[in-house]
Amino acid sequence: YDPSPLQDFCVAD
């Protein structure tokens, strides 16, 4: 889980 603003759509888990 990486709460990155760039991958916020990908790390919703």
From Swiss-Prot:
Protein's name according to its UniProt entry: Germin GS1
Quaternary state and interactors: Oligomer (believed to be a pentamer but probably hexamer).
Assigned GO CC terms: apoplast; cytosol; endoplasmic reticulum
Inducing stimuli: Increased by salt stress in roots and decreased by salt stress in coleoptile.
Role, per record: May play a role in altering the properties of cell walls during germinative growth.
Modifications after synthesis and translation: Glycosylated.
Keyword annotations of the record: Apoplast, Cell wall, Cell wall biogenesis/degradation, Cytoplasm, Endoplasmic reticulum, Glycoprotein, Microsome, Secreted
